[in-house]
Amino acid sequence: MSKKKGFTVLELILAIVFVGIFVVLFFMQKVNADAMDRDEKRKVAINAMFYALEEGYYANNQYYPEKIENAEVLPWIDPNLFTDPYGVPLWNAEGGSNYVYESKNCEDGKCKSYELRSTMEKEEDYVKTSRN
């Protein structure tokens, strides 16, 4: 009796199952890593806005702005940082941005404090509050 060369059906099925499991695990890790990367970008942006508000805006004016309506309010940072990872700017009138600037204790457009917040995917919201 001659022996045939090749793979059995069982060997082929097992190989396909192993490859399928590997592909699923790879994509699960990739999705998780992408979300963590977006969260890091959000933290960088919030920190940049925070330091621009504290070291730039407040140092020059002795108060905080009531709104951040455009990048010109905080010219000390890269204007691209005002746009969240999904492309929605902080001042979007329709909302939907991952970034929120909430001024507090305001009088005539001059505010005594604020809160910066970013909605995160893999952890709690990232929040920075004014120093003063």
Cite the ranges covered by each PLM segment.
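N-terminal single-pass transmembrane signal-anchor helix
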Residues: 2-30
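Low-complexity, S/T/G/P-rich flexible repeat/linker segments used as non-globular hinges
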Residues: 123-132
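Conserved hydrophobic/amphipathic alpha-helical signal-anchor segments
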Residues: 24, 28-74
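Extracellular/periplasmic head regions of type IV pilus-like filament subunits
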Residues: 54-122
